[in-house]
């Protein structure tokens, strides 16, 4: 038995009303889109007009070629309009950097971004875990990234095999804050404050999401002047929240600011400083590193640390 199509049974006037409603809805959406586009063009008129004016009318194209080549590191082959935004971003970020001394704000060209990602992966591959004796483990972390996070997860059982651990963060210049929070959280009770990020208009508190899968009688952290950013954050997270942590080495770098890398079109990206971060004890370390509880600059720091367990 075939089902009847109730829609086709509606009177012609009712069908017409329905189609009119749909037509009006489409018109409203289209009108809103046109209005928003016009408003956007109005707000950005000066920039858009300048972009069209310079890329389409400026006669000294050899000057343009040189500027594009200098800023983007490649010959854009006369495609001034297409590459204009990336060139402007490069110029502006360099000016910001020179004015403020903020060396962490800049444009990535496609080749630079690929190189940076590959170097991050290669650096992470140098992380290692060693069993030192029947009481202690050695964990060296070379950066904070999805690679080192996976490294720790993959070796979770090995990390549980001893009652003491020496974490080597020397020359670790930091990395991704989300990876750092997850990695630090392995040593902390659930919902423990790891860090607070202060943005221009709001703040975000990071808390550990695990129930301390890695517990030790004693944790020793090795640090030096190249221990920076997310590494310093991990040191503060463990040292502020646990009573069994000993910091050995020299004062850390003192980087209490954070950056975000924003992907752009055609493989470009822009990195900019967008936050200050605070330790669980509400301290911003920018310009002032973390002092070790046990200063040490002699040889064989690993044996020195092992003797303190």
Q: Residue locations for each model-derived region?
A:
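Gly/Ser/Thr-rich loop/hinge elements
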Residues: 121-124, 173-222, 226-229, 257-262, ...
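Non-catalytic, well-ordered alpha-helical segments in soluble enzyme domains
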Residues: 231, 235, 239-243
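Flexible, low-complexity junctional segments that flank or bridge functional domains
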Residues: 2-165, 169-178, 182-185, 189-195, ...
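Soluble periplasmic/extracytoplasmic beta-strand elements of cell-envelope proteins
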Residues: 53, 93-95, 137-142, 164-170, ...
């Amino acid at each position: 038995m075939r089902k009847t199509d109730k829609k086709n049974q509606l009177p012609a006037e009712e069908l017409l009303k329905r189609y009119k409603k749909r037509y009006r809805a489409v018109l409203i959406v289209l009108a809103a889109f046109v209005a928003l586009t016009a408003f956007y063009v109005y707000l950005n008129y000066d920039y858009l007009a300048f972009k069209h004016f310079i890329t389409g009318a400026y006669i000294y194209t050899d000057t343009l070629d040189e500027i594009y080549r200098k800023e983007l590191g490649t010959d854009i082959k006369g495609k001034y309009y297409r590459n204009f935004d990336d060139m402007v971003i490069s110029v502006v970020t360099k000016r910001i950097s020179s004015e403020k001394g903020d060396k962490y704000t800049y444009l990535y060209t496609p080749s630079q971004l690929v190189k940076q990602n590959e170097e991050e992966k290669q650096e992470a591959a140098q992380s290692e875990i060693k069993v030192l004796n029947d009481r202690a483990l050695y964990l060296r972390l070379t950066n904070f990234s999805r690679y080192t996070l996976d490294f720790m997860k993959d070796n979770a059982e090995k990390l549980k095999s001893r009652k003491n651990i020496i974490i080597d963060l020397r020359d670790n210049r930091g990395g991704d804050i989300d990876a750092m929070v997850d990695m630090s959280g392995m040593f902390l009770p659930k919902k423990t404050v790891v860090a607070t990020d202060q943005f221009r208009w709001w703040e975000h508190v990071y808390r550990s999401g695990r129930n301390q899968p890695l517990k030790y009688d004693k944790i020793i952290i090795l640090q030096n002047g190249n221990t920076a950013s997310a590494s310093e954050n991990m040191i503060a997270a463990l040292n502020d929240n646990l009573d069994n942590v000993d910091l050995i080495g020299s004062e850390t770098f003192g980087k209490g600011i954070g950056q975000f890398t924003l992907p752009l079109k055609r493989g470009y990206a822009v990195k900019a400083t967008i936050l200050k971060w605070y330790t669980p004890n509400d301290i911003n370390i920018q310009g002032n590193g973390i002092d070790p509880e046990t200063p040490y600059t002699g040889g064989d720091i690993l044996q020195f640390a092992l003797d303190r367990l």
